[in-house]
Amino acid sequence: MKAAGEDSLDKFYEAFWGHIKFTLSNAARSMWTGITGARGLPSPACEDTKRYYQQMTRFSTAFALLADVSMFVIGGSLKRKEKLSARLGDVLSLLYLSSCALKFYDQRGRLKDELPLLRWALYDCAFKIQVAMNGIIDNFPNRPIAFVLRRLVFPRGLTLIQPTDQMGHEVADLLIQPSAARSRLIAGIYLPDDENDVIGKLEAAMHAVIAAEPIEAKVRAAKKAGRLTTHGAEAQWDEAMKLSVITETELAQWKRARALQHDIIMVDDFDLHFGKQVAAPAWQQAEAAE
């Protein structure tokens, strides 16, 4: 851009051909890293995150290639092709988020208990990057160039997968019970003590449900042993208290946990007449007031 503003054809050609060489080298590198799965690329000396650094390097190269080719072929019209430019923006954002996650993990001392969180986040980002890049190529206006781009960016096809259910379970296990990793993750976020606040109620429900687990275990054991003969949760718990399986305090503790749990899972639960008065025309509201 500087060369274009100067009255020097030599400087312009130097910058122009330098950029062409850069794009061609990115094309070759993108194809090679796609074939090899980015294996062999330099990365920080940490086996737990090595492959993620390599994959993000591969996608950074592919992104530079797609952005350069898009500008070269589409030019100023790229800003009017909003879905195409938005996908390029998605890739850039996801690369940035992936870099932040890796840097965050590295600077906090590469704590092993945070690895499931990092793994899930990077699998998710990598898959979404793949989807966005595939969308760019699928909708590229110049189809012959799109054909070439697909061979350069995805020489082995779409090989990345979404985070597996097992990864999700590992993350959930960290988040649904108190742990050092969970405490570090939520440090500094808004977390009120008020149970009338949705976030505060969620935190209170977690602690209440965990505290009630040993009590529930005693009731289940009594039921399995045939000591409880009633049906229905409420009746069984009342019977368990009468038989001294649990104390009155434990029964109250279980009921509180059950109530909090019920409130948390009842999403989009509104009164039957919620909003009816506001939705009614003004003349109907006036008649109702009379």
PLM features: residue spans?
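Flavin-dependent oxidoreductase catalytic core characteristic
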Residues: 1-290
